[in-house]
């Protein structure tokens, strides 16, 4: 029995609301149960120095948590003078995931920066960030299209979304909240495109090693869950 009472293959209530920030070219408020992330997409007419003159653009991401996004206040990383290894890992993951779905040549020599700010954390902040980041990116590209700023209409080649899975009390389950994640024997994150291809898989045995059969069960749960998330992304962008 899951603490929330959900079925093993049941997502938390998910909400993807785009266009929530007045000044950003693209934005999305994403909610996975009690996890909430505000995502913005900013268009910048500049590129990293190493990309200049190559005839293509770039999509990058930054990630952070508000001090009281968690049960106890967490010091702002800016006040500590450096980002944690976890923060760097997550924002690189978000950027990598988004770039797999973007035609960077069609984007042109400009950069889109995705900012993911966790307002409230109850498990799955990186997967929620990726799922909401795609909506914010699509919102930004729609803004650009309306202003005839794109070389063609196919800059965004596919959706990308992410979900967590794990083995909790011996049972493979979908979309772990904090109570489950902190007690799970195994936890994994899956990032997939809209057509079901894998972008990234992160899996860790916290207590007991897991079998290939259990991994395939987790992946099947993830495929099903991400399919539903992609449908919600499409609804958000309709």
Curated annotation (Swiss-Prot):
Gene3D superfamilies: GHMP Kinase, N-terminal domain. One of its GO terms (molecular function) is 3'-5'-RNA exonuclease activity. GO terms for biological process: rRNA catabolic process; rRNA processing; tRNA processing. InterPro entries: ExoRNase_PH_dom1, ExoRNase_PH_dom2, ExoRNase_PH_dom2_sf, PNPase/RNase_PH_dom_sf, Ribosomal_Su5_D2-typ_SF, RNase_PH, RNase_PH_bac-type, RNase_PH_CS. It is an enzyme of class 2 (transferase). Phosphate binds at residues 86, 124-126. The keyword Nucleotidyltransferase applies. The keyword Protein biosynthesis does not apply. CDD domains: RNase_PH_bact. Keywords: Nucleotidyltransferase, RNA-binding, rRNA processing, Transferase, tRNA processing, tRNA-binding. It catalyses: tRNA(n+1) + phosphate = tRNA(n) + a ribonucleoside 5'-diphosphate. Its EC number is 2.7.7.56. HAMAP family: RNase_PH. Homohexameric ring arranged as a trimer of dimers. Phosphorolytic 3'-5' exoribonuclease that plays an important role in tRNA 3'-end maturation. Removes nucleotide residues following the 3'-CCA terminus of tRNAs; can also add nucleotides to the ends of RNA molecules by using nucleoside diphosphates as substrates, but this may not be physiologically important. Probably plays a role in initiation of 16S rRNA degradation (leading to ribosome degradation) during starvation. PANTHER family: EXOSOME COMPLEX COMPONENT (PTHR11953), EXOSOME COMPLEX COMPONENT RRP41 (PTHR11953:SF0). This is Ribonuclease PH. It comes from Afipia carboxidovorans (strain ATCC 49405 / DSM 1227 / KCTC 32145 / OM5). The lineage of its organism: Bacteria, Pseudomonadati, Pseudomonadota, Alphaproteobacteria, Hyphomicrobiales.
């Amino acid at each position: 029995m899951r603490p929330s009472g959900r079925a093993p293959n049941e997502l938390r209530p998910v909400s993807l609301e785009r266009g929530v920030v007045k000044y950003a070219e693209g934005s999305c408020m994403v909610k996975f149960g009690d996890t909430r992330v505000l995502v913005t997409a900013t268009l910048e007419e500049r590129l990293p120095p190493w990309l200049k003159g190559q005839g293509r653009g770039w999509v990058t991401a930054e990630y952070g948590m508000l001090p009281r996004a968690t049960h106890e206040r967490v010091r702002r990383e800016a006040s500590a003078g450096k980002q944690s290894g976890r923060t760097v890992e997550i924002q690189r993951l978000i950027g990598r995931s988004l770039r797999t779905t973007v035609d960077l040549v069609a984007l042109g020599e400009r950069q889109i920066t995705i900012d993911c700010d966790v307002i409230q954390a109850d498990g799955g902040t990186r997967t929620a960030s990726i799922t909401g980041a795609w909506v914010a990116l699509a919102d930004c590209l729609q803004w650009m299209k309306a202003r005839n700023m794109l070389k063609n209409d196919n800059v965004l080649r596919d959706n990308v979304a992410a979900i967590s899975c794990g083995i909790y009390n011996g049972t493979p389950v979908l979309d772990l909240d904090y109570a489950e994640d902190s007690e799970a024997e195994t936890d994994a994150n899956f990032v997939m495109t809209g057509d079901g291809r894998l972008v990234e898989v992160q899996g860790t045995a916290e207590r007991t090693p897991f079998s290939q059969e259990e991994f395939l069960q987790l992946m099947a749960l993830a495929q099903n869950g991400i399919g539903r998330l992609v449908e919600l992304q499409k609804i958000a962008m309709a």
